[in-house]
Amino acid sequence: MREFLVLFNHAPTSPDRVRLKDLPGSGRFDLVCRVTTQALLYSHGVRTDTVVHLLLRGPDDPPKTITVTGRRVRRLYPDERTTAIHLRRALEADPDTEPHPGIFVRRADLEDLLGEMKGAKLYYLSEDGRDLEEVEPEPDAVFVLGDHEGPTPEQDRLLRRHADAVISLGPIPYHADQCIVILHRYLDVKRPPEYAHGPSNVM
C-alpha cells in the first residue's frame, strides 16, 4: 500500500469555513482538494493501492485527519468543487465515522498518526533531503510532506526522528500536489501497479 500524509496547518477544520465559491480563500482548501485528487486519480481511474491522509490543523476545531482510501472511495472526480463537497461533509461528521464511502474522519494529530504508522517505511520530503534517486524509496511506504507553508519546526523535528530517510525531489521546490505526481511516476516505473496498461501520455 502506498500512503501519503500531507500536513495543512492552516486548512479549516470547521465545515462553515469551507466556502465552495472561494476555496483559495478558505485556508487554501483548494490545495487540500488538489492533493486528494492527485494522490488518488489517474487518467480514467482511481488508484486502488493508495491512501491519502489529510491532517488539518486550522480553525476552528483542530486537529482533524481525513483519510481517503482509493480502494473504497466512490464518486471522486478531478474537479476541486466535488472533492471539496466530500471533504466538507467529512468535517461535518462526527469523529471516527465514514460519512462518504472511502472517506474517514477522526481526531488525530501528527504524533498520533506517526504512532499508528510505526513499522511502515516512512519517507519525509524536505528540500534538504537526499536525492530521490539515491535513496530509492520502497513503493509500499508512507510519504510525508507539508503544504505550501511547510511543517512547523516542532513537526519537522518529529518527522526527522521518525523517518527512515529524508528525501528531496531536486533543486526546485514544488507544490505538494506536484510532489505527489512526481513520486507516483517514479514509483509506478519502479513497480507498475496492477491497473497499469503500459506507457501512456494521456493526462
Curated annotation (Swiss-Prot):
It is found in: Cytoplasm. SUPFAM superfamilies: alpha/beta knot (SSF75217). The keyword Mitochondrion does not apply. S-adenosyl-L-methionine binds at residues 125, 146, 179. Signal peptide: none annotated. Homodimer. GO terms for biological process: tRNA methylation. This is tRNA (pseudouridine(54)-N(1))-methyltransferase. It is an enzyme of class 2 (transferase). It comes from Methanopyrus kandleri (strain AV19 / DSM 6324 / JCM 9639 / NBRC 100938). Its EC number is 2.1.1.257. NCBIfam families: PRK02135.1 (NF002560). Belongs to the methyltransferase superfamily. TrmY family. Specifically catalyzes the N1-methylation of pseudouridine at position 54 (Psi54) in tRNAs. InterPro entries: Alpha/beta_knot_MTases (IPR029028), TrmY (IPR007158), tRNA_m1G_MTases_N (IPR029026). It catalyses: pseudouridine(54) in tRNA + S-adenosyl-L-methionine = N(1)-methylpseudouridine(54) in tRNA + S-adenosyl-L-homocysteine + H(+). Keywords: Cytoplasm, Methyltransferase, S-adenosyl-L-methionine, Transferase, tRNA processing. GO terms for cellular component: cytoplasm. One of its GO terms (molecular function) is S-adenosylmethionine-dependent methyltransferase activity. Its main location: cytoplasm. The gene is trmY.
